[in-house]
């Protein structure tokens, strides 16, 4: 496993996005209910955020709860919403200590009022922090995001000939956030699950078999080290990139 000291800090991805997969399977392996896996995942979140701060990552987006997750058993959904409130209450002090700003993206009106209120309180308390921005994707799906962006464009009377990539980007939830440089997905699945589809056009993907509750700072370093081994071309040839064109 790579250590933080082994990472070239001048080539750290500015924005790391993470699909935190495997909580339920981890819990079943421990012969517990799925919610136990979500509760145990908080250690992985804390370790990963603190690791990102130490590495110099400026933005980290965690796929926390998708719009499709509303279809899960009601007891699990209710437990997740309560866990979200508890996590925010417990971690605000740590976010302040690490100078991390918290923000959210997604269809937030679907969240229970108590969950939304506590999240907004934490966002207000941390809004002046500058070391890292931690983005929680809550009640989020990329297709929903793109659809709501198009609705806003139509509502403002913008004509088709005046719509380009930058227009659409302006109306996305992430308009003030750079696109992810690196996507990490834990749990062994090889898909992006309706997450940041527009934003990940040139993102490097890293998949690991590690279930999310077992993910630690050294695992984050492994992903970043693999990212640093790759050549990002953005449509150019290898020769052009090496020539600095």
Model-derived regions: residue spans:
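Flexible, compositionally biased loop and terminal segments
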Residues: 1-245
């Amino acid at each position: 496993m790579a250590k933080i000291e082994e990472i070239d800090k001048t080539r750290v991805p500015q924005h790391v996005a993470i699909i935190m997969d495997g909580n339920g399977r981890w819990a079943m392996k421990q012969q517990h209910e799925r919610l136990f896996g979500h509760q145990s995942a908080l250690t992985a979140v804390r370790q990963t955020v603190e690791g990102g701060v130490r590495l110099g990552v400026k933005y980290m987006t965690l796929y926390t709860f998708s719009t499709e997750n509303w279809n899960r058993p009601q007891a699990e959904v209710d437990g997740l919403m309560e866990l979200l409130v508890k996590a925010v209450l417990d971690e605000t002090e740590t976010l302040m200590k690490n100078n991390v700003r918290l923000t959210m993206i997604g269809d937030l009106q679907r969240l229970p009022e108590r969950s939304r209120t506590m999240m907004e309180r934490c966002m207000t308390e941390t809004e002046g922090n500058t070391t890292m921005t931690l983005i929680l994707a809550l009640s989020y799906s990329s297709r929903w995001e793109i659809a709501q962006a198009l609705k806003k464009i139509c509502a403002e009377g913008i004509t088709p000939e005046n719509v380009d990539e930058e227009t659409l980007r302006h109306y996305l939830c992430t308009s003030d956030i750079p696109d992810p440089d690196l996507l990490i997905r834990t749990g062994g699945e090889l898909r992006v699950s309706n997450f940041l589809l527009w934003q990940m056009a040139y993102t490097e993907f890293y998949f690991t078999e590690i279930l999310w509750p077992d993910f630690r700072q050294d695992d984050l370093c492994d992903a970043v080290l693999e990212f640093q081994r790759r050549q990002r071309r953005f449509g150019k040839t290898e020769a052009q990139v090496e020539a600095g064109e």
